[in-house]
């Protein structure tokens, strides 16, 4: 069942009150959404793909939690929070929010790439729904 999206402002306020906040010089957020262009077209350049009208999305919470724990082992990373939607989603719906906090920009950028990449590749299942015509 589709969930209500969290407030990034609230997440940032919570992060800045967290015990790790004095060590953090940068927070970086990611907001993945359902797009109309099929993954096959965007990632692989396949021509003639139908437009996406939605997606069925699910995830393995234990795997996500394990990946978050691994993210804390990266250099300079002191804060990580993830929210994932689920169920049948429409174009424009939020799929994922990620907030990463760390000491310096290169560490935080690398950690965001690492965390989002591992979640997308190891923890979620996405089934695109296409237009019929």
Name the predicted role of every residue range:
Residues 1-94, 101-133:
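N-terminal, polar/charged subdomain of small-to-medium soluble alpha/beta proteins
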């Amino acid at each position: 069942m589709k969930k209500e999206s969290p407030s990034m402002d609230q997440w940032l306020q919570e992060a800045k009150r967290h015990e790790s906040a004095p060590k953090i010089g940068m927070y970086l957020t990611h907001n993945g959404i359902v797009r109309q262009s099929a993954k096959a077209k965007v990632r692989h350049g396949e021509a003639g793909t139908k437009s996406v009208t939605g997606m069925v999305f699910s995830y393995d919470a234990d795997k996500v939690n394990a990946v978050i724990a691994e993210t804390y082992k990266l250099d300079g990373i002191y804060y990580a929070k993830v929210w994932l939607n689920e169920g049948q989603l429409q174009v424009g719906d939020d799929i994922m929010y990620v907030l990463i906090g760390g000491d310096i920009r290169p560490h935080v950028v690398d950690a965001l790439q690492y965390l989002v990449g591992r979640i997308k590749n190891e923890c979620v299942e996405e089934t695109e729904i296409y237009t019929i015509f």
